[in-house]
Amino acid sequence: MTLAHIAKRTLNVSVTMFHALSPAVPREATERIERHAKNAGWQLELINANEMQDPNYLENPVNRCFFCKSNLYSRIAQFTSQPILSGTNLDDLSDFRPGLEAAKDFEVRHPFVEANIGKRDIRLIAEDLGLDDIKQLPAAPCLSSRIETGLHVTNEKLMLIDSVERLLKEEFGLGIIRCRVKRVGIVIELEETLLNKVDCNLRQKVDNLVRIYGHNKGVEYSSYKQGSAFLREKL
C-alpha cells in the first residue's frame, strides 16, 4: 500500500491501483484499501483474480503462490496494457517466493527491489508519509498460506481462518496472529507476548467458533513460527 501512495504523489501519469477480492484476502484488508483509496483519491479497481476456480491453486501444492499470482497478473493485464508494479521488497527475495516466477512471466516490475528497499525502510517511508495506520502493521500473507501444504484450499477453511483471526485481533489488537489448518488439526500461533495472555475464557471462545465450521478436535496453541504450514520438503 505504501507503493500506491508513493505512485499517486510522485508520478505525473495516470495510475490505477488494483486489489484482489478473494476469500483468501481478509475483509479488513479490503476495507483498509478502500479507505486509503477514498482519502488519497486513488483510481482503485477491485477485481476477482479467479484463483478459486483454478484446480492447480486449490490443490495447494508447494508452488501455490505461482498459480495465485499468475491468475492475478493475467486478470490485471485484461484491464491495462501499462506496466504492472508490485510492492515486493528486497527482504522478500530471501524467502521461497514462487509468485515471483509468475511476475517474470508478466514482466512485472518491483520498484522497492530496484531501489534496494527492504521492509524496515518501507516502514520508515510510511511514517514519513504520515501513514500511521499501516506503518506498524505486521506482515499479512494471504489466508491460504495458513493451510498446510497439500491440504486443499476451500472456502470453508478460509472462512474459519478469517473468523478465528478476527476474534483474536479483537482481543489483542496488533500483533502476529496465525490460525493454521494442519493435518493434526487447528493450531493457533501467536507471538510470545500474546501467547502469554491466552486464558480459559478465550480458549472457550475459539473452541466454540471452530465447532461452527465442523472442527471438534481441541485447538492447539504455540509460538509463532514463520511458514510453519509450508511443507516444501514433502512435495
Predicted regions and their residues:
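ATP-dependent adenylation/nucleotidyltransferase module used to activate substrates
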Residues: 1-128, 186, 205-216, 225-227, ...
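A short interface-forming secondary-structure element
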Residues: 183, 187-201
